[in-house]
Amino acid sequence: MHEKYGNVVRIGPNQVSVASPEAFHHVFVTRCSSFLKTDFYATIQPGIGPNYAGLFNYINHKQAMAERRDLQPLFSPGSLKHYEARFDEQLDILMEVAKQREKVDLFGLFKFFMLDVIGDLALNKSFGQVTSGKEHQYVIDFNNAFMVIGLQNTFAPIIPLIPYLPFKKLKNAYYGLQRVFSYSQERVEDYLKQDMSKKQGSLMSGYLDPATGEPKDGYSAWSIALAGHGFIVAGSEATSITLTYIIWMLIKRPDVDQRLRQELSRLSKNYSNTDLANLPYLDAVIRETLRIYPPAPAPMPRVVPKSGFEFEGVSYPPGTVISAQPYTIHRHEGVFEDPDEFRPERWLDVPSEKKDRMYRAFIPFSAGQRG
């Protein structure tokens, strides 16, 4: 669509889609506090009804920033180092299970693995899927619940009527979604009963008063359950998708695989996350995979503020919905030459100006304070 009609395409009465990295940066980064998320984010929340929130779903910018400040210390380099040991424990389990099998469904195993990791890091309790080899009921219910989440976005008034409709699958999805949050709340309640010494360092500890171990003002067990669910879904799905695509590309490209193996062979036996961060080709392979296969390729709608918006000589009135998607921007030929070609080397040994342009246009998980 953008190849045919240009950087800006009108896709509805008051909606436009943009494929320009410059327009994206202005809307999502420079003026992210002015270009607010649309009501779409309220309707895709996994709870029944539009009144629940989470860090990704907040439309209110100040509310989102307050929660972000509480969580920011948990993603500092020091905190990430603390997570390494716990991650390695889950990785050892993964490797042991994989060695016992002749054939491995990598995507399925990665999904099990990442859910176990995030469950442990967020609430101090792994789901144990890698060991059991079975999908946890929580995951089954949530996957089925997407039927309800989709309806919530398009036919919200129908949601309360689902229990009375003669559609078994839809009813199962509805009640499954309720079980998802009942389970999340049970996990959080168990988590809150733990000693603060155990809770410190977990992803959910940012919501707690360090002196009492209880939820800070503005949070409750229910809101923490919603946040925990958000961490689990985002952390497990996006990472497992990316890991699978990386392996797939290495299989398709033996030359890339060989060069990456050579770089990895220089690591010491007890390497750390810091050591990995200093491997330029590994970084390039990951970036190039995320560029071609962003795990969240969908549009991210924003609303033009009262001051309006002008781009490439065209004025957009207040209330206009502007959307952009990583998939399209990552294929902008003005930034990425031969954009459909998997070429990790494009990130290495390039002039600083060109590298800066690529980094600004690299948005696999969106960009700016709101994502």
Regions found by a protein language model. Name each.
Residues 77-81, 175, 194-196, 273-280, ...:
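Conserved, non-catalytic sequence blocks in retroelement Pol enzymes and Pol-derived host proteins
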